[in-house]
Amino acid sequence: MIRFELGNQICVCLSENDISLEINNTLHHAIPVSSNEYAILSTIATYGSLNAPISQRVIERKITQHYKMALPENGFKNAVAALRKKFRKLTEDHVSPTRNIIENIHRTGYFIPFTMLHTHQSGIYQQKRINQHTKNSVRKALRICLRNKRIYTDIAWVLLVTTAIFFSVCYYAINSIVKHNYLDSALDIADSLSQMSCYADEDQLKGLFDNVKLVESSMMLDRFNIRCLVTPEAVVPVSQKAFNEWSDNSNYTTQSFDINNATILVRVKNINLQNNVESHISRFFLSGMKLYTNTGTSFEIGNTNGRYFHYQIKDTGYKEVYYISGPLKSIILLSLFFLVILRHRSLQAFITYLFAIREFHIKLEPIYNTSTQQNIHYEALSRFKVKNTQRFIETLISNGLLLIHTILVIRAIYAKQPTLLVPISINVCPSLLRGRNFSTLYQELASRDCRLLTIEITENASMYYTSEIYDNVAKLKLLNCKISIDDFGTGNNNVSLISKINPDYLKIDREFVIGLKSDDKKVETLRQLIAMGNTYRCTVIVEGVETADSAHLLTTLGAYIHQGYFYPLHF
């Protein structure tokens, strides 16, 4: 019996009488095959391969030699078509193969694209382990983010600047109130009145209010012990009763001055004083003001329930107390506001990232050696639910979020274990190979066994490689990481980079494979890239292999290690 492994505990088995499907070592379904079909499939499985497909003529000759039978006219093509149909019928409800049971390279020959040994077992176990660990990715990404010291440094700076701004605004508001306060005007008018008497020229007394703000009226007991009321409209003598009524009016704030043997009482209408002060009071800064006069009156403006911030006392007995709106709460709210303003793009990108990884998973894509028919390692590819993955990754790079995702991938593939089950490569942007980013990345890897880990340096045309990056790549090699250059032949990933990094692998971009069969220039370019990799003793990997024709053509050019949809990891 010949077995063709399709994936995890699933294979197609060929016997002389039937072709069957086994799942978990249990027969699931079987379809009879003819002797011709058995002879053809077993011959191709024995003698054909991707690197050396077997032609129809050779197959027919082998069948004649080993089975002592000759195929009828068109018998070969009919048998191949029947076998493909039976294979699809067996597997359609269990796997979605991108390959037929028999693949044909035009004018070259036939081969079986499935191995007769189970090469995926460890890779599938590793994939299952990763799938378990990629659950709750949002919470894990937040945890990684909160351990980033740079965040707390930024917050500390914003808090310091916000605190300085907060108290500066409070001082400015207080100074503005003091500058426009009625006390200075009241003192000026009191000083002027004390030098005159109630019998002075009335127009002159009334004119004292022309350049005075807020002061509504004044009561004077002059040096001749004459009591009078002075207003912008009139000067009239008053009785003691009228004086008391004038002084005790709760709608006014009154201050007394004893100057030049005269007693001057100046009063301001509370509503005018309030309107003048309220323009300097706000919810987040100066919340209120309370003033006391030497006549025993006091007046509150705004909210005076909080903690006082500043007060001043005049020699005249006048006192002002200023209150602020919960400084801690205000500073925190203002800091959050400034953080949103300053980092709104990064915050928006991070929120978008968190939404994208709600259904995030990592797919292991095999890197297959066609000569040994073994997977040499697997690339961990991130899969997001976004419209444009490339643009999404570029957004992460531009907003400094790629490090968080790279650490998330590292933790997912290790799945809380010290080592990997199979060799795995992860993509690392050059921006993570310098400065604080590299320090964090290195610290994450240093605590793990990296002998099966490959760091795949992606192409970034906007970034130049520096001596710092070369030195840091050398540090990764000391951790036993292998190094791979992705997208070789494009952008900055060129020959100069190979000579300085000495990578283990060179990955040729899929753009060189698309349309390869009909483009002689691409064939020649690819041949030169492969030769260049061999010159620098690098293992060359070709990406984007999606068809049997492309896979075989690459082997004729000397590229035997492939990656692409033609080599899926089936469960």
Curated annotation (Swiss-Prot):
Membrane topology, as annotated: Multi-pass membrane protein
Any further remark recorded for this protein: Overexpression of the gene results in 52% and 60% decrease in c-di-GMP levels compared to the wild-type strain in cells grown to the exponential and stationary phases, respectively. Overexpression promotes swarming motility and expression of the swarming gene lafA, but it inhibits biofilm formation and expression of the biofilm gene cpsA.
CDD domains in the cross-refs: EAL
Its EC number(s): 3.1.4.52
Mutant lacking the gene: phenotype: Deletion of the gene results in 33% and 61% increase in c-di-GMP levels compared to the wild-type strain in cells grown to the exponential and stationary phases, respectively. Deletion mutant shows a decrease in swimming motility.
First-listed, main subcellular location of the protein, grouped into a coarse class: membrane
Name used for this protein in its record: Cyclic di-GMP phosphodiesterase TpdA
Organism encoding this protein: Vibrio parahaemolyticus serotype O3:K6 (strain RIMD 2210633)
One GO MF term attached to the UniProt entry: cyclic-guanylate-specific phosphodiesterase activity
The EAL domain, residue ranges: 344-571
PROSITE patterns recorded: EAL (PS50883)
Regions crossing the membrane: 155-175, 321-341, 395-415
Domain of life: Bacteria
Cellular compartments annotated: Cell inner membrane
UniProt keyword terms in alphabetical order: c-di-GMP, Cell inner membrane, Cell membrane, Hydrolase, Membrane, Transmembrane, Transmembrane helix
Enzyme class: hydrolase
Entry's induction text: Promotes its own expression when the levels of c-di-GMP are low or when its enzyme activity is inhibited.
Cellular component terms (Gene Ontology): plasma membrane
Annotated PANTHER family: CYCLIC DI-GMP PHOSPHODIESTERASE PDEF, SIGNALING PROTEIN YKOW
The reaction(s) this protein catalyses: 3',3'-c-di-GMP + H2O = 5'-phosphoguanylyl(3'->5')guanosine + H(+)
Function, as annotated: Cyclic di-GMP phosphodiesterase that plays an important role in modulating the global c-di-GMP pool. Its ability to alter the c-di-GMP pool has an effect on swimming motility, swarming motility and biofilm formation, multicellular behaviors that are important for the survival and dissemination of this environmental pathogen. Exhibits a dual function, namely, c-di-GMP degradation and modulation of its own expression.
Entry note about domains: Contains a putative N-terminal DNA-binding domain, followed by a degenerated GGDEF-like domain and a conserved C-terminal EAL domain.
Pfam families documented for this protein: EAL
